[in-house]
Amino acid sequence: MDIKFESIEGKSFEYRVMMIVFAGFTVAGLLATWWVIQKGIWVTGMYSRAPWGLQIVMAVYYIGLSAGSLVISGLYGVFGKAEYKPFARIAVYIAMLFLIAGLLSIITDQGRMARIFIQPFVHFNLQSMFSINPILYIGHIFICLVYLWALFYEKKTLTKVVATLAFGWAFCVHTGTGAIFGFGARMLYESPLLPASFVAAAMASGTALMIIMIVMLFKLTNRIVDDELIIWLGRFLAICILVVLYFLLVENAY
């Protein structure tokens, strides 16, 4: 299958509207972050019975989207399915962006933001997921950069190697994120099933994100997308949702 990539000229009305919308979201996010810093993180919904505010909730969601999106790119990079090659680049790019977004959410949740760049590395504890996860996150971003470079320059051997590493690393990233929440509040949280449930949720949300992004971007740029590929991704999403529902059923059965 011969696939050729073309750059978007960025002159269409739809493209400009999309950029304006994204710019609006960016400005709103910066203003909201400034407001949180000025007023304190209590404005995100934290109080005595809710130890996590909006940032931590969104950080977990962003990291899940990142890990799930990277798995989609593995359909081409790891398993060699050439029909998914057009989605590989955007999947890796989205994975990197959402992980950075998750890390920014965590940073704004800290009372002393500067410490987050020092403490996990100076006082490293191999038995603490809070020490291990920063290594996983930074490694994830680095792997995505190398993966993108290999995809753009058509380095097939390197793509295969890095894609395989990225595929496994994505599971480690969200397994580590799920392990942070392994506290004794509910039965599922006390068991090894929690990291697995986080991975399942990540794959479901990441696949859903990729379907939305692919369909939207192809329509806005007047490009044709193979319906069969979207249908296959939809079936994969359905399986992931069923797995997530199973975990929810197990959690709430007590």
Where are these regions (language model features)?
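Glycine-centered flexibility motif
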Residues: 38-40, 53, 64, 98, ...
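Membrane helical hairpin/interfacial module
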Residues: 50-115, 132, 136
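Long, contiguous internal "core" modules enriched in hydrophobic/ aromatic residues
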Residues: 8, 13-15, 19-28, 81-83, ...
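Intrinsic structural disorder
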Residues: 46-50, 55-59, 95, 201-204, ...
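Short hydrophobic alpha-helical membrane-anchoring segments
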Residues: 32-36, 73, 77, 105-106, ...
